[in-house]
């Protein structure tokens, strides 16, 4: 039973899981703990990187991974907990010391069929945790906050939350804000940008304080956290323009990243994106509509079509631009599309 030998922190939600889990790991590691990480990009035991196939591994793989982490001396395990993992009972007998709900927006409806079923899948995590931290900027988060039976706190940009952000200043290379809780405010400077990252850092900070770290320990560590590759990642180019790579693959995520970047963009905002194959088709036109609302020019391309025809996927995307006046180009080959976007 390696799951009895470590303390578990779970993070669930449509967007923000990877960044939030990585910031939690960074804070705990900076304060002397050995931490295991289980997530979308990779699994980690301290600095050791392990390959992953699923956000939440199958139960037999997960238990083997737990054993490696326990034998290595991990104090904590921070994991992304997917809706698939919960519905399919992949996490087995794992009990969580703390669990975070980031948000719930359209995704995986090819599997869950309805948003209600998707919500109920996410909610399962909060029946196996001692403490819940819930984002009440999100409508489903507000609902969840009224339904959980464990100890609970809330976070968000809204001042109605237990942990909230004030005086937020976004820049191309970072963000500053005041973290407010318990009637006090603390200045925070992070090397990440985007309103969504303010929310992710709030969540990670609140969880670590719940685990017993002081605000000074948390905030000192947060300032040195650089974020996650492929999550609002600024790519150095040496050119007179900025390039940002982001994982946004839902309508809400597209809107969030473009809305944030738009705030400090000088000149045009060019958005290059595609949609994955063999996944929820109904979000494709919605992603295009979200992109058209904030970008000045779109480059529409292929993004891991799997078994589908890339051109058919692009036609689904273009349906979302009906009636829009935004200029766009279709370049099916992704490498050529990136070159075109740079040009």
Regions found by a protein language model. Give the residues of each.
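Walker A (P-loop) phosphate-binding motif
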Residues: 1-43, 48
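Acidic, Mg2+-coordinating active-site environments of NTP-dependent enzymes
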Residues: 5-6, 72, 96-242, 266, ...
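Residue-level signal for inorganic ion chemistry
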Residues: 11, 38, 62, 80, ...
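Conserved nucleotide-sensing/catalytic segment adjacent to the nucleotide-binding pocket
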Residues: 50-82
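Switch II (G3) loop of P-loop NTPases
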Residues: 74-84, 242-249
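Conserved helix/coil segment N-terminal to the catalytic DExD/H
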Residues: 84-92
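Active-site beta-alpha connecting loops in nucleotide-dependent enzymes
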Residues: 228, 254, 258-324, 334
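C-terminal structured "cap/appendage" subdomains that terminate the fold
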Residues: 321-343
